[in-house]
Amino acid sequence: MTTIGTPLTPKATKVMMLGSGELGKEVVIELQRLGVEVIAVDRYANAPAQQVAHRAYTISMLDGEALKALVEKEKPDYIVPEVEAIATATLVELEQAGFTVIPTAKATQLTMNREGIRRLAAEELGLPTSNYQFVDNFDDFKRAVEKIGIPCVVKPIMSSSGHGQSILKSVEQIPSAWEYAQQGGRAGAGRVIVEGFVKFDYEITLLTVRHVHGTSFLAPIGHIQIDGDYRESWQPQAMSAVALEKAQAIAEKITGALGGRGIFGVEMFVCGDEVIFNEVSPRPHDTGMVTLISQELSEFALHARAILGLPIPDITLISPSASKAIVVEGKSTQVVFGQLAEVLAEPHTNLRLFGKGEVDGHRRMGVILARDISVEKALEKARRAYDKLEIAL
């Protein structure tokens, strides 16, 4: 029997979020709706999820000793990683000491770098993937590009939101692609993956929930990325029954190997009826923000239920829907959003502003959500709303 205590009392059910971005913020809100006491941790102060949590801490989550000390101080019932840049060896140690890591410490460790998850998917599970090679230095990088062929995709083994990722289209770009990957890695310069370029009709995220009663799939989500960074997503993505069956089989296999409970974002390329595995995140996915308007239970609500061991009897899609990221470019510590009445003027349109304190370069600061009778109309509605938004730096 699942029980939940009262927050801020000795019997509270406590969750510690490691990483406090916009996805974590939505998870915190869903957990609090269920009466959970939440502690939000990040490397910088006043991160989005910290703004809504019961307590917040600012530490380097790559510092294993600091992380261990904080966990032992708070003694959470569940540790929920929201980002890759965490001392995963410490999570393994904490799990062995009796703490519950969501979904598992192994899943966090394998998916924090592209090498672990690619070797699991391709070499252990035999899932279809692009050709790939891992390299540590520039000379090996040049040889890998020659072997894989141009065009190819270059990524640091540890990065997120497209940082350090590029499509190499000519020999002349080899030095700049290497340098960009070295600058974009989460843990600094280092190992890189070179992937063969996959010709595909579209990309999907198949959100997959492992819960107390098994594995459930959300309707597939289509998306557009720019340099690996999500800009638009929609649900459902139309695909053949054969392709959907293959995608679900891949998702079930990879999430089953990672184990534990929670939501996973499984990214795949689709070409006709063929499906190729790309990546998996053992946490809510940015393209899944569309579920805030498309579903009865968003990916964040589903994650909260799965974490707590609560049942997920049904996943209901309300209507075709779309999301459009609000990406702000420039430099400011006091971004102001205007024309909001106009942005929200149409029915079934919504908005999330993440509360991020500053931008320096470009940064995702919010998302526009829209529902309609078709994905196409929902996308048009989201774009219309976006065009009305005013941003002052």
Curated annotation (Swiss-Prot):
Task: Tell me the route in metabolism or biology where this protein functions.
Answer: Purine metabolism; IMP biosynthesis via de novo pathway; N(2)-formyl-N(1)-(5-phospho-D-ribosyl)glycinamide from N(1)-(5-phospho-D-ribosyl)glycinamide (formate route): step 1/1
Q: In this entry, which stretches build a coiled coil? A: none
From the UniProt record, report the name of the gene that encodes this protein: purT
Q: Which PANTHER family match?
A: FORMATE-DEPENDENT PHOSPHORIBOSYLGLYCINAMIDE FORMYLTRANSFERASE
What is the recorded name of this protein? Formate-dependent phosphoribosylglycinamide formyltransferase
Q: Name one Pfam family in it.
A: ATP-grasp
Gene Ontology biological process: 'de novo' IMP biosynthetic process
Q: Which reaction does it catalyse?
A: N(1)-(5-phospho-beta-D-ribosyl)glycinamide + formate + ATP = N(2)-formyl-N(1)-(5-phospho-beta-D-ribosyl)glycinamide + ADP + phosphate + H(+)
The organism's lineage is: Bacteria, Pseudomonadati, Pseudomonadota, Gammaproteobacteria, Pasteurellales
